[in-house]
UniProtKB/Swiss-Prot annotation:
This is [LysW]-lysine/[LysW]-ornithine hydrolase. The keyword Isomerase does not apply. Catalyzes the release of L-lysine from [LysW]-gamma-L-lysine and the release of L-ornithine from [LysW]-L-ornithine. Zn(2+) 1 binds at residues 68, 92, 146. It comes from Saccharolobus islandicus (strain Y.N.15.51 / Yellowstone #2) (Sulfolobus islandicus). Pathway: Amino-acid biosynthesis; L-lysine biosynthesis via AAA pathway; L-lysine from L-alpha-aminoadipate (Thermus route): step 5/5; Amino-acid biosynthesis; L-arginine biosynthesis. Pfam families: M20_dimer, Peptidase_M20. Belongs to the peptidase M20A family. LysK subfamily. Its cofactor is Zn(2+); Co(2+).
Length: 346
C-alpha cells in the first residue's frame, strides 16, 4: 500500500509540474497538445482531440472523469517545496485533472474502462463541455473534477445568465445637457441590482459599463453587462423580465446561459464518492456552490453525476494556488474506489 502511494505521488509530481509549466488560459488549450500525446503513449490511453474546442479525451468507456485544462489568466512559475506544488491551475483544475488521469491509468490497467477529459474553456463559456454534449456521448456516470477540499461532494450549482444591454440617447454639450445617459442608466442599475446574499436568493450584478467618447459631450451610447445567478428554485423568466421592464428603452441580448443543476443524494455517483471517502476515514460533506461548473452542462448526457476533487477551493483564481501530493493521492484513491464500485454495479 505504501509503495503504491509513493508511486502515485511521484507520478503526480512529475505530471503536475509538467502541466503547470504549460500556460493554458481559456482559448489556448492547444498549448497542452504534446503533453496529452505523451500521456496517451505512456499510459496506453487512446487520445481524441475535439476539433471545435480543442478539448482532450483519453481512454474509452461509459464512465467519464471530466476536468478542465484551461485556467484563468496569469502565469505563475511552478515550483515544489516539501511536497507542496505551486502554480497557476494547481488547484483549479490541473491538480484534480492529474488525479483523474492517474486514476484512469490505474483503473484501465485493472481492466476497468474509464474515459478522462481535459475540457477546454471551463473558465469562460464551457465550449468544451458543450461540444462533448453534441458528440453523441452518453455516459452511465460522470465525476466532474473541481477542487472541493478533498472532502466535499458538490450536488448543486446555481445557473447563470449573461446579459448585454445597449442603450442610446441624444448627445449634448455637457455644460448645458438636460439629460445624461450615464446618470439615467445608473439609477436603473441601482434599482435592479440584487447583491449576492445567500444561495437561494438570485443575484443581479453589473460587471461592465462603457459609455462616452469626449470629455465635454454626454454619451450617445452605453454598454452594460449583467451577470445573473440563480438557484434551481428561482424562476429564470421572472429575472429576465424584471431587467427587461427596467430597461425598456434599451436593447437586451442573452450572450450566454447555463442552467442550474441539482442531483439527488441517492445519485449513484454521490453514493459511491461518499463510500469512497468513508473507506479512507474521511468524513464527506454534501455541498452546493454559488457559481457554475461543467457539471451544469454535462448533466445533459448522464443521469448520474456529481463533482469532487482535491485542492482547497478558497485558493481558486488566486496567486497562491497550491496543492499537496497527499491531496492528489487522496483524490486518486477516491476516484478509483468510487469507480470500482460503480463498475461492479454496472
Amino acid at each position: 500500500m505504501q509503495q503504491e502511494k509513493e508511486l502515485v505521488k511521484q507520478k503526480a509530481k512529475e505530471l503536475l509540474l509538467d502541466l503547470l509549466s504549460i500556460y493554458t488560459p481559456s482559448k489556448n488549450e492547444t498549448n497542452a497538445t504534446k503533453f496529452f500525446e505523451k500521456i496517451s503513449n505512456e499510459f496506453n490511453l487512446k487520445l481524441e482531440i475535439l476539433p471545435d474546442s480543442n478539448s482532450f479525451i483519453l481512454g474509452e468507456g461509459e464512465i467519464l472523469l471530466a476536468s478542465h485544462v484551461d485556467t484563468v489568466p496569469g502565469y505563475i512559475e511552478p515550483k515544489i517545496e516539501n511536497e507542496v506544488i505551486y502554480g497557476r491551475g494547481a488547484v483549479d483544475a490541473k491538480g484534480p485533472l492529474i488525479s483523474m488521469i492517474i486514476a484512469a491509468w490505474l483503473l484501465n490497467e485493472k481492466g476497468i474502462k474509464v474515459m478522462v477529459s481535459g475540457l477546454a474553456d471551463e473558465e469562460s463559456t464551457s465550449i468544451g463541455a458543450k461540444e462533448l454534449t453534441l458528440k453523441n456521448f452518453n455516459f452511465k456516470h460522470i465525476i466532474v473534477g473541481e477542487p472541493s477540499n478533498g472532502t466535499d461532494i458538490v450536488v448543486e450549482y446555481r445557473g447563470s445568465i449573461q446579459l448585454d444591454i445597449m442603450c442610446e440617447s441624444t448627445p449634448e454639450h455637457s455644460s448645458s445637457a438636460k439629460s445624461n445617459l450615464i446618470v439615467d442608466i445608473s439609477k436603473k442599475i441601482i434599482e435592479v441590482y440584487k447583491q449576492p446574499e445567500n444561495y437561494d436568493k438570485p443575484s443581479i450584478v453589473p460587471t461592465i459599463i462603457r459609455a462616452g467618447e469626449s470629455y465635454n459631450v454626454t454619451p450617445a451610447k452605453l454598454y452594460l453587462h449583467f451577470d445573473v445567478r440563480y438557484a434551481i428554485n428561482n424562476k429564470r423568466d421572472d429575472l429576465i423580465n424584471e431587467i427587461k421592464d427596467k430597461f425598456q428603452e434599451c436593447g437586451l441580448k442573452i450572450v450566454d446561459e447555463t442552467q442550474p443543476v441539482k442531483v439527488s443524494i441517492n445519485n449513484p455517483v454521490v453514493k459511491s464518492l461518499t463510500r469512497a471517502l468513508l473507506k479512507q476515514n474521511i468524513k464527506p460533506r454534501l455541498v452546493r456552490k454559488a457559481g457554475t461548473s461543467d457539471m451544469n452542462i454535462l448533466q445533459k448526457i448522464t443521469t448520474s453525476i456529481a463533482t469532487y476533487g482535491p485542492g482547497n477551493s478558497m485558493l481558486e483564481h488566486t496567486n497562491q494556488e497550491k496543492i499537496t501530493l497527499d491531496e492528489i493521492y487522496i483524490g486518486v484513491k477516491t476516484y478509483m474506489l468510487a469507480i470500482e464500485e460503480l463498475w461492479q454495479k454496472s
